[in-house]
Amino acid sequence: MNTTDDVSCAEIYVSGRVQGVYFRGFTQKTATSLGLMGYAQNLPDGRVKVVAQGKRSCISELLDHLHIGPELSNVECIEVGWMGLSDTFTDFFIKR
């Protein structure tokens, strides 16, 4: 049974004006404050990919923040896929 305290992993794709507007830094700061591990990465197609591991409730809270984004961003769409824990991260970082 999945509860909000289960450790989960989400693969998130954020579309819109999300590159060059501090979106990855915003994501890293927010995820770290929520105790999440993983990374944020710019993709060649203009999206940002986020992999977040931690309590499902914290990932859901991160998603709420990502919908808003930093001041200069304009989030148009967020796609979320829940996946098994394949990698173990020790922090939340910006992947280049």
From Swiss-Prot:
Enzyme active site: 24, 42
Keywords recorded for this protein, A-Z: Hydrolase
InterPro entries: Acylphosphatase, Acylphosphatase-like_dom, Acylphosphatase-like_dom_sf, Acylphosphatase_CS
UniProt superkingdom: Archaea
Enzymatic reactions: an acyl phosphate + H2O = a carboxylate + phosphate + H(+)
Acylphosphatase-like domain residues: 9-96
Cross-referenced Pfam families: Acylphosphatase
Enzyme Commission (EC) number: 3.6.1.7
Record Gene3D superfamilies: 3.30.70.100
Family as reported in the entry's similarity comment: Belongs to the acylphosphatase family.
Protein name: Acylphosphatase
